Amino acid sequence: MNRVSIRRAFWAALLLVVPALSLHSGLLQEPPRAFMDAAGPGWRSLGESDFAPVNGNPDTWTWKDGLLRCSGKPIGVMRTREKFTNFEMVIEWRHLKAAGNSGVFVWVPDEALAQLKPDVLPDFGIEVQMLDHGYREQYEKESGKKGDWFTTQGDIFPVGKSKLKPFPPLSPDGSRSFPRKNLTLGFGEWNHYYVRAINGELRLWVNGEEVSGGNGADPRTGYLCLESEGSPVEFKNFRVRELP
């Protein structure tokens, strides 16, 4: 084979190898898929029979036509009947009034719920917050304090005795993971939350994009609790998938 033939063979081989390397590199860099559509094997819906009352009134939580409605009164929670460790979760929610406040508590142990009185929230768990945009104005007006220690975009933070190392950006005191993007919609509009919880790490996607999270949670096994906190809110399409 002469030099021209060798050179041509080299460039032909290179044209085949480079795209293959690029494809391989792309596959390595692609992040794990988040199953935000809640479709596929293992996903299941959570309905009325999957929840147990904790410290609400009989009419605090009502189910009708696929919707779960919370009156917001008294303050408290409702829990799942089973505990979860590693899982994916999707839930849609909307506040029915401006300045509404609610959330999902993750990894809540038995001791935090035993004999919990009305108008009291658990002192354990990681909260995935659901606030309406009007909440900050209401808080500042009623308290006379600056509402810079929270956002209305999907904060994640440990409650009471639970521990979590929040991902940045952080709240001024470092206790909360503030969202990287502002994606939540105002009262009357549905928001979609996707949560992935694995080995003490929690990540939140709001309306399709990852925004906040944390790791090093303790405890990292427990109930999922929906929060009633003074204002009416609705939930739908609550689905979970347990992970190894």
Give the location of each predicted region.
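Carbohydrate-interacting regions of secretory-pathway proteins
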Residues: 26-244
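Bacterial N-terminal signal peptides
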Residues: 12-22
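Bacterial N-terminal signal peptides that target proteins for export
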Residues: 2-13
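Serine residues within intrinsically disordered or low-complexity segments
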Residues: 5, 22-25
